[in-house]
UniProtKB/Swiss-Prot annotation:
The keyword Transit peptide applies. This is Miltiradiene synthase KSL1, chloroplastic. Keywords: Chloroplast, Lyase, Magnesium, Metal-binding, Plastid, Transit peptide. Residues 1-51 form a transit peptide. It comes from Isodon rubescens (Rabdosia rubescens). The gene is KSL1. Abietane diterpenoids (e.g. miltiradiene, abietatriene and ferruginol) accumulate specifically in the periderm of roots. The ent-kaurene diterpenoid oridonin, main constituent of Isodon rubescens, accumulates in leaves. It catalyses: (+)-copalyl diphosphate = miltiradiene + diphosphate. Mg(2+) 2 binds at residues 329, 333. Highly expressed in roots, and, at low levels, in stems and leaves. Mg(2+) 3 binds at residues 473, 481. The keyword Metal-binding applies. InterPro entries: Isoprenoid_synthase_dom_sf, Terpene_synth_N, Terpene_synth_N_sf, Terpene_synthase-like, Terpene_synthase_metal-bd, Terpenoid_cyclase/PrenylTrfase. One of its GO terms (cellular component) is chloroplast.
Length: 626
């Protein structure tokens, strides 16, 4: 098997993307500059040594003359490490077919209990995690020998090995899985103790352990990539049999490529923020005097979901709906009167613009026309993507969520007593996950039929992810909503036990978190299951949104009062990764050799110097170096 890049051309518009001094002053963020990026358009094939090394490491020894089940891969540990590294550095999308082939081979070896996998703890744990996440049927019982700490010789393993066991334990999809439950308990305890006693001398490894322990299921994809790039260290895999060969692959060239890929995505996210801000202003949402302005927050969250430049429309549709849902939710809560809130629902049901005087108030006009124009625009775009009209679906989703807002408004204003089930029956919709996902999914490159969108699977995916986000949100907003007499799941849990054994707030919060965890595992079961109605590409969106909920509400309300998010926003959207001169030279230094291969007119901008050259047919990516 050979590994080859298959990258798309990402045209560079030449627009300058500048920092926002008002939000992130230059003196506080030295990496941010008001100068435009120095554009580097180069062929990734210029780093020929790197390509050769990657191909060599992925070139499994497959004997095609023998039955498939006897396929032997002598380099399975290295292959798995490469896959893990590609994923952690955010460039795995370029190698997906090769990764799939290697995991197929790994699964065959797993079924045969081959020594390549089972003789090494790190390889064993990594194989389990990668295979389970991909949907292969692998039993956690195979990790039973490591489930109890007393059965593991800690003198013979190191912290990276325990990290791999810890990550494997996080893939528990059922409450009954005692093996992974016990594995999680001792590995998390061990790693926490290592941090407390400063027993990890390697600073990068210490920070990586701390990052995993803080909020593992709240690690957003692109934030995880940024952290991995900052803490990248090939020594993480030094215990493996193939460590020497692997370390030769993971050199500065490879890291430079991953950093450039990150900076390309970051430039795209900045462009999307500008588009989002123009849309916000065009909709006059910036003139509203109430509620939360979450434009930057929505841009950050959608950027953290995916860095693929091709998915710009997905991110923008999602971000716009985060903004719209938040603005209208705030209007229903405290920005407008009951009659004005009802009016918005009536207007959406009618779906017709009216003269300004018929809206009743300027706020109602602004909110309705923002929804009306945005949905109509997205419906036209989605018609092209899907090959059919989806406007009725989009309107239906808006009627649904506004109807839930109305139910909640009536309930709390009339002081109606609710059970927890009654509350959750509407609040899982009003959290907004369903409408944001199903509308943005129209631009994912997958044809979505009515059968798919109306299926029980779709409902279950939406409900489980929404329940996670709703319950975790309730835990963090419980005190505020109790003062406002609006109530949430925590207050309802407290009320439900008044006539039984009374529970305190801490116990009620624990119950709410347990229910959120139950729904998270249910979501994982559907996402990891193969042969379902939705392709994995679609189901992954639900998992990404679940991580957003875990990120936002793990220790506070980061959505309403962002604190950690502000630091993360700087590193993801504003601060480019440094491409050190030696690394840059490794990637773009062979421009002369490249220019000799030219076949089509092209302009190569290298460190602000322009060379009019031709473009070889295999140049598929634009790299920006700051």
């Amino acid at each position: 098997m050979s590994l080859a890049f298959n990258l798309r051309v990402i045209p560079f518009s030449g627009h300058t993307i500048q920092s926002r001094r008002g939000l992130f002053p230059v003196h506080e963020s030295p990496m941010i500059t008001t100068k435009p990026f120095a554009a580097v358009k180069c062929s990734l094939t210029t780093s020929t040594d790197l390509m050769g090394k990657i191909k060599e490491k992925f070139n499994g020894k497959v004997h095609t003359s023998l039955p498939a089940i006897t396929t032997h891969s002598a380099d399975t540990p290295s292959n798995l490490c490469i896959i893990d590294t590609l994923q952690r550095l955010g460039v795995d999308r370029y190698f997906q077919s090769e990764i799939d082939s290697i995991l197929d081979d790994t699964y065959r070896l797993w079924q045969l209990k081959k020594e390549d996998i089972f003789s090494d703890i790190t390889t064993h744990a990594m194989a389990f995690r990668l295979l389970r996440v991909k949907g292969y049927q692998v039993s956690s019982e195979e990790l039973a020998p490591y489930a109890d700490q007393e059965h593991v010789n800690l003198q013979e393993i190191d912290v990276p090995t325990v990290i791999e066991l810890y990550r494997a334990a996080q893939e528990r999809v059922t409450e009954e899985d005692s093996t992974l439950k016990k594995l999680y308990v001792w590995t998390s305890t061990f790693l926490k103790q290592q941090l407390l006693t400063d027993a990890i001398p390697d600073k990068k490894l210490h920070e990586q352990v701390d990052y995993y322990l803080k909020n593992y299921h709240g690690i957003l994809d692109r934030m995880g990539v940024r952290r991995s790039l900052d803490l990248y260290d090939v020594g993480h895999y030094k215990t493996l049999k193939a460590a020497d060969g692997f370390s030769n692959l993971c050199n500065e060239d490879f890291l430079a490529f991953a950093r450039q890929d990150f900076n390309i995505s970051q430039a795209q996210h900045q462009k999307e923020l500008q588009q989002l801000q123009r849309w916000y202003s065009d909709c006059r949402l910036d003139t509203l005097k109430f509620g939360r302005d979450v434009v930057r927050v929505s841009n950050f969250l959608t950027s953290a979901m995916s860095g693929d430049p091709e998915l710009s429309d997905v991110r923008l549709a999602f971000a716009k709906h985060i903004v719209l849902v938040t603005r209208i939710d705030d209007f229903f809560d405290h920005g407008g009167s009951k009659e004005e809130s009802y009016k918005i629902l009536e207007l959406v049901k009618e779906w017709k613009e009216k003269p300004a005087g018929e809206y009743g108030s300027e706020e109602v006009e602004i909110l309705f026309t923002a929804v009306y124009n945005t949905v109509n625009e997205l419906a036209e775009m989605a018609h092209i993507e899907q090959g059919r009209s989806v406007k009725d679906l989009l309107i239906k989703l808006w009627v649904e969520i506004l109807s839930m807002f109305k139910i909640e408004l009536d309930t709390w204003s009339d002081d109606t007593a609710l059970t927890l089930d009654e509350y959750l029956s509407s609040s899982w919709v009003s959290i907004g996950c369903r409408i944001c996902i199903l509308i943005s999914m129209q631009f994912l490159g997958v044809k979505l039929t009515d059968e798919m969108l109306l299926s029980e699977e779709c409902t279950d995916l939406c409900r489980h992810v929404s329940m996670v986000d709703r319950l975790l949100n309730d835990v963090q907003t419980f005190e505020k909503e109790r003062k406002e007499n609006t109530g949430n799941s925590v207050s309802l849990l407290l009320a439900a036990h008044k006539d039984e054994r009374a529970i305190n707030e801490e116990e009620a919060i624990t119950k709410a978190k347990d229910l959120a965890e139950y729904n998270r595992r249910k979501l994982m079961q559907i996402v990891y299951k193969t042969g379902t109605i939705f392709p994995r590409k679609c189901k992954d969106m639900f998992l990404k949104v679940c991580r957003i909920g875990c990120y936002l509400y793990s220790s506070g309300d980061e959505f309403t009062t962002p604190q950690q998010m502000m630091e993360d926003m700087k590193s993801l959207v504003y601060e480019p990764l440094t491409i050190h001169p030696p690394e840059a030279n490794n990637v773009v230094g062979k421009k002369t050799e490249l220019c000799q291969q030219l076949v089509k007119p092209y302009v190569c901008h290298t460190f602000c110097k322009k060379y009019t050259v031709s473009r070889p047919s295999n140049v598929m990516m634009t790299c920006y170096i700051d």
